[in-house]
Regions:
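Phosphate-coordination loops involved in phosphoryl transfer and adenosine-cofactor binding
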Residues: 2, 171
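Active-site and donor-binding regions of nucleotide-sugar-utilizing enzymes
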Residues: 3-166, 177-189, 198-201, 209-211, ...
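Short acidic-hydrophobic, aromatic-tinged amphipathic segments that line or gate anion-handling sites
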Residues: 151, 228-232, 311-314
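Nucleotide-activated donor-binding/catalytic signature segment of Leloir-type glycosyltransferases, i.e.
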Residues: 217-232
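A donor-sugar binding/catalytic signature common to diverse glycosyltransferases
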Residues: 231-281
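Leloir-type glycosyltransferase catalytic cores
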Residues: 282-349
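C-terminal alpha-helical cap of glycosyltransferases
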Residues: 346-363
Length: 363
């Protein structure tokens, strides 16, 4: 008999993780049907609700979506209760209110909220609401109640990224990754573009999200006629010797690929001030955060020798990034990259699929 699996995947990355999980389930020859809210183009299956209207950035941006969210929250909960398993991936602000309304369905949270960074109360809340918590960071369990049903399932990027053990050769190509949200791009891409203009001996490649392929890129990025465009992040990054990126997750991706990286993040001032008051972290790049914990058992350790990659937040200009590029510590980067891969150990898709298979057998 076919099992019904509900999936809630709002963000682009969450849909990629969901796809890998679904592929691993199919490799086990399990009979199942997928329902929920996810990207039809990525999952290659019809969804009952589209996540496109709910992808926002920042504290103030989400306010505009509240009326629409309340309209479908009950519908999503009702759909989940018609399924055998409900899997919620990332996006805790979106998912937790839905989970609270679900009864008599096994609830799994995959890609847990970063309670180690802010809103620590969510750890106890999710432990109460969910049947299983699937963590993708080795130290996450230390921030949850001891009686929580939480386990480390591996990191999904080790499934998705052809990480490299060899040092990059000089290719004269540099990747620009200013984010996937339009507000990110608006704030950051003009600075990245200026960087590209001031390093004329390198070829710069703008890596755009795949779902931008049919959109007006000039409307999103502005004038980009002198910059090559790519919609294939991993294939493109493998050809690059350096990257400028905007997100903490992207730094983990580039590090696993062996691409020396600089992180730069700029948002609306209101959002920045709110985040600064709530988030108590020394770093925002995941590679830096993970290594901080690996070496010091403390994600806020001030005595970390040096970050594996430089980080620039809010108050910087193109010249700041250029100076960091010219002074980058390549030797330390490649040494710490190996430490990071060893720390994460393995990917998560197969482990999660096996857990679901065991649930099928025991039901």
């Amino acid at each position: 008999m076919s099992k019904k699996i509900f999936i809630s995947a709002i963000e682009y990355s969450a849909n990629i993780h969901a796809l890998k999980l679904i592929q691993s389930l199919r490799n086990l020859n399990l009979n199942f049907e997928i329902y929920g809210i996810f990207d039809e183009q990525i999952i290659n299956q019809k969804s009952q609700f589209s996540p496109n209207d709910f992808r926002v950035m920042g504290f103030s941006g989400i306010v505009k979506l509240i009326p629409k969210y309340f309209d479908i929250k009950n519908k999503l909960a009702h759909l989940a209760m018609q399924c055998d398993i409900a899997i919620f991936i990332d996006s805790s602000s979106f998912n937790i209110p839905i989970i609270k309304k679900i009864q008599n369905t096994k609830i799994i949270y995959y890609i847990l909220p970063q309670v180690w960074a802010w809103k620590g109360y969510r750890a106890k809340l999710l432990s109460t609401l969910c049947d299983e918590l699937w963590g993708i960071i080795p130290f996450e369990k230390d921030y949850y109640p001891k009686d929580s049903n939480i386990c480390y399932v591996g990191h999904p990027l080790l499934d998705e990224i052809p990480y490299s053990n060899t040092k990059k050769q000089n290719t004269n190509k540099i990747a620009l990754m200013p984010g996937s949200r339009k507000s990110e791009i608006k704030n950051l891409f003009p600075i990245f573009k200026e960087v590209s203009q001031k390093i004329p001996d390198k070829k710069f490649i703008l890596i755009a999200p795949k779902n931008f392929q049919n959109k007006n890129l000039k409307h999103i990025y502005g004038e980009i006629e002198n910059i090559e465009i790519s919609f294939e992040p991993y294939n493109t990054l493998k050809e690059c010797e350096f990257a400028f990126v905007c997100s903490g997750t992207a730094t983990l991706e580039t590090t696993l690929l062996g691409i020396p990286t600089i992180l730069a993040y700029k948002t609306r001032m209101l959002d920045f001030l709110i985040a600064k008051s709530l988030v108590k972290l020394k770093f925002i790049g995941l590679a830096n955060i993970f290594l901080s914990y690996k070496y010091h058992k403390n994600i806020n350790k001030k005595k970390l020798q040096a970050p594996i990659h430089p980080e620039f937040l809010q108050f910087f200009n193109a010249q700041s990034l250029i100076d960091a590029y010219h002074n980058f510590d390549y030797e330390r980067f490649f040494k710490e990259k190996e430490s990071l891969i060893n720390y994460l150990e393995y990917g998560s898709a197969k482990i999660c699929a096996n857990k679901l298979q065991n649930f099928y057998k025991n039901k």
